[in-house]
Structure formats: structure tokens, C-alpha cells
Regions:
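Core nucleotide-handling region used for phosphoryl-transfer chemistry
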Residues: 1-339
């Protein structure tokens, strides 16, 4: 299964944008990355000579052979044919999950339910990349909380004293809302909310030779609609004109957007900053992390993140708290990179 592609900072990669590029701006979500694929997995080898088949079955994958024995096995393996079987595989950014025990969260049980969402739905060779947001199965926030008081009174007035990146999820998996009617003084109504949720941002197709083809964002959304899963919200789609200073997007407010200089990267950054700040459109009770700008017309996944100032402040606070409590020493590279 192909690894997660690191999303670099937009501000340091403005030169990546060229006139004529098609771009798409989506919401950057603060969660933990996960991927699930329905992929050809090597199950064994087949050789014509039945006598050698037993040797291949026993020693082909062994790492404890002597140099002479390894050479003998390698000679037999020259005419061996690989046997593949299609299997569902899940992982984090760079780790394939053999099981859902342990890990930074104590258990990856909350990941398992989302992996199973795709069973029976992915086509052979497809891999889906998604963000898991909300809370773990124990009710703990997937991502660290933020102390809003360090951002000033106005920020606290709007978002409260603490930021919890809930994205509409609930620690218990349900919540109660108080409803009134003419016949009743009021009643508590149980409303189901997920403890955690997923949002897809990338899909690929991998063949048996290991060649990977990137799905376009539109086709990714088509497949997600078929599977009944959500995608990251889209803010804008646009094309950079031949001079680099105009953004053309007839279906939204960016039509004819002009930057003072004819530089594609600077123009894209200015457009991205129209969307990267403010309340999160899903969570609404907390700020958004920022945006991701993807160059759609590239054969490989090419995207850059742009985070807003308030989120960066909250992230630094979370890092400081993790250092003070010693929690950062238990974090994997995946968790640290998400802070």
C-alpha cells in the first residue's frame, strides 16, 4: 500500500504553481490520518517442479538461511510465479496496522470501525486516504485540546475557554437536546452523534505491478458518493490564467480574481487566504485549521497546506503541554506531525 504523501507548506512552495494550473481549495481538518486499500497481497509462489514447491513454500521468505542455502532457493525462485490474493489493508501515515491494539491512543479500536466501512465497497486496487476526527472509543479527543485564553477575550467569547476539535462528534456517541412544544413544557431528545467521523481527501488505483494512478478530485467524490462516505469540504475550484495573475472560476466568487503582480504562486496564496480562517464549517464550535490547495492537473498527488495564525498559536500551546507532561515522548511521528 502506497504511503501517505506529506503535504508541505504553501508559503514555501509558491513556485510550484504555474500559469494554466487547475487548483482546488479544500478544508484542512485537524485529525489523524488513515488509509485503507483493497490490494493484491503476495500469498506465495508457484513452481513447475512439485519437489521444489515444498522448498519454496518453506524457505522463500526465510531470513535465517545460510549463504549457500539462500543461493539455492534463489535459483529455484527464478522460474517461480507469484500468487496474489486481494485483501483489505489499513494503516496510518507510514505504518500498516496488523491489529488495532496499542499505539499512542492506548488502542486503535476507533480506527477499526472506519477501516471496515470500506470492506465490500472498494474496487480492486483502490486505496482511500482519509482524516479521522472527533474522539476515540474512550471519549478522549483524537487531537489535543487548545487553551483559548492565550488568544484573547474576543476569541474566548466566540469559542469558549477551550478548543476541542470535535467536528460535530460527541465523546459519548450521543447527545441530548432540549425541545419545546405547545403541549409539553419541554423534553430531552436523544440525538445520535458519532464519536468519530471520517473525511476522504485522496484516492488511488494500484495494479498488480505496483503502478499507482491518482484519482481526480471529482472522480474521488463520485466514488465516495457510491460508497456512502464523506469527502473534505470544497471551498473553490479555479484555473490560473496564462499570465499567472488571474483566477478564473465562473461558478463562484473568484471569477476574474486579480492579484497585483503576475505571479501564479502569490495569486494562489491570496486566494487561499480567503478561506483559511474563521469558524470551522463542520464543527462550527471551533476554528478551522486552514486549507489545502491541490494542483489537480498533475499526475502525482500535489497539494500544499496553509494554516491560519490562531490555529498555529493553539498548536504551539498543545506542543508545550505535551512536552511539559511528557506525553510527546510517547507520540509517534504521525501524532506529532498532526499537532
Amino acid at each position: 500500500m502506497s504511503e501517505y504523501c506529506d503535504t508541505e507548506q504553501l508559503a514555501y512552495n509558491l513556485s510550484a504553481f504555474k500559469p494554466g494550473d487547475e487548483i482546488e481549495i479544500t478544508l484542512k481538518m485537524h485529525g489523524t490520518s488513515q488509509r485503507t486499500g483493497y490490494l493484491p497481497m503476495l500469498k506465495g509462489w508457484k513452481v513447475k517442479n512439485k519437489f521444489f514447491q515444498g522448498i519454496v513454500n518453506k524457505y522463500a521468505s526465510s531470513s535465517n538461511l545460510s549463504t549457500f542455502a539462500r543461493k539455492c532457493v534463489d535459483i529455484v525462485m527464478r522460474d517461480a510465479t507469484p500468487i496474489y490474493d486481494w485483501s483489505y489493508v489499513s494503516g496510518t501515515r507510514r505504518t500498516v496496522l496488523e491489529n488495532y491494539d496499542g499505539g499512542y491512543y492506548g488502542s486503535n479500536e476507533f480506527r477499526e470501525q472506519h477501516s471496515k466501512t470500506f470492506e465490500g465497497k472498494l474496487w480492486k486496487g483502490e486505496t482511500v486516504y482519509y482524516e479521522v476526527v472527533g474522539f476515540t472509543h474512550t471519549g478522549a479527543p483524537i487531537m489535543a485540546e487548545g487553551n483559548n485564553e492565550k488568544l484573547g477575550k474576543d476569541f474566548v467569547k466566540q469559542y469558549g475557554k477551550t478548543t476541542v476539535f470535535s467536528y460535530g462528534c460527541d465523546p459519548e456517541g450521543e447527545s441530548f437536546k432540549h425541545e419545546y412544544s405547545d403541549c409539553w413544557d419541554g423534553m430531552n431528545v436523544r440525538e445520535f452523534k458519532p464519536q468519530s467521523d471520517i473525511y476522504v481527501y485522496r484516492m488511488t488505483m494500484t495494479n498488480e505491478d505496483g503502478n499507482v494512478v491518482e484519482y481526480s478530485p471529482d472522480f474521488m467524490r463520485y466514488r465516495c458518493e457510491q460508497m456512502g462516505v464523506k469527502c473534505v469540504p470544497v471551498f473553490a475550484k479555479a484555473t490560473i490564467d496564462g499570465e499567472g495573475g488571474h483566477i478564473y472560476a465562473p461558478d463562484n466568487e473568484l471569477y476574474g480574481f486579480v492579484h497585483e503582480t503576475n505571479n501564479a504562486g502569490d495569486t494562489v496564496k491570496l486566494v487561499a487566504e480567503k478561506y483559511y480562517d474563521g469558524p470551522d464549517p463542520i464543527g462550527k464550535t471551533h476554528i478551522r485549521e486552514g486549507v489545502v490547495v491541490r494542483i489537480v492537473n498533475r499526475p502525482k498527488f500535489t497539494a500544499f497546506k496553509h494554516k491560519n495564525f490562531d490555529f498555529k498559536v493553539l498548536s504551539n500551546i498543545a506542543i508545550e503541554q505535551a512536552i511539559e507532561t511528557g506525553a510527546i515522548g510517547k507520540m509517534s511521528d504521525d501524532e506529532i506531525s498532526e499537532l
